[in-house]
Amino acid sequence: MQAKNPELSVIILNYNTKELLEDCLNSVKAHMDEVPMEVIVSDNASTDGSPEMVKKKFPWVKYTEGANEGFSKGNNRARPLVDGKMVLFLNPDTVVHKDVFLKTVKYLKEHPDVGAVTCKLVLPNGKMDKDIRRRFPTPWISFQRLVLGMNRAYWYEDIPENETHEVDAIQGAFILTWKKILDKVGWYDENYFFDGEDVDLCYQIHKAGYKIIYYPETTVTHIKGVTKGKVAKWKYKVTPQQRKRLRLAGVISMERFFKKNLWNKYPVIFDYFVIFGINVFKIVRYVKVTLLSSY
């Protein structure tokens, strides 16, 4: 089933999403003839029978597993198994449609100035997943979004969703890039546990001199929210403690991203003001998730 000399390595990180992972793998399998490719599943200590399902129903898939140490480490765990020149990070809560591999790989190969590309992600209700194209969370963009509730700039709502264009960041649910670029920038930063690692990776790709492209000429369905335990329909559960950690992860990642990438780009007093604001937001988020988890 796997290509002997794959052009593309598809990495799927799984944590207790057995049914969705099976659907995802079936959709990938249906379109593997589009590009010489291999599929790698990295499992973060699932307990729902996912590992057994993969080994039984998809014996041709390369498989690796380890402790649940987060999104970054889980994806990076697959690195030694990669034989393709291109790497696609794909979420298990996605369904791949016709020509996705063919068109996105073709686009990346034909544009040497592009370091990463994504397709259009569509939610089950037919609407676009807006997080697929984002601007970097600079202080001004973050202030508009978190304080003023204005997401238009953050989500590129000033540009039609069916128009191919350059963006700051794309979502970790579908990131196609070159392995040589990942090796250059160091793959995912493992200091991020969950949330923010995809934005940081895009930032490093930009720093390396490449463009990030949103390419809506082909689509993938994204059952969004599953990895955060928000979609009960799929019978995916997380404990209240896990849910609290996941909801706080975004704020923690926000602080990490700012300190790593934006610190010293502004006056020092402004840097500390931003960190103060993030920590206030962290406290508010902590109180909120603590109260919600008690019900």
Residue ranges and their predicted role:
Residues 1-30:
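N-proximal low-complexity "stem/linker" segments adjacent to membrane-targeting elements
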Residues 27, 43-51:
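A conserved acidic beta->alpha catalytic loop
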Residues 64-82:
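Glycine-rich, basic loop-to-helix element that forms the pyrophosphate-binding segment
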Residues 87:
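Short aromatic/hydrophobic "clamp" motif used to bind/position activated sugar donors
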Residues 95-131:
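Conserved donor NDP-sugar-binding/catalytic core segment of glycosyltransferases
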Residues 136-168:
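Short, flexible, basic/aromatic active-site loop/helix in glycosyltransferases
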Residues 162, 168-221:
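A short, conserved alpha-helix in the catalytic core of glycosyltransferases
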Residues 207-292:
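Active-site-adjacent helix/loop segment of glycosyltransferases
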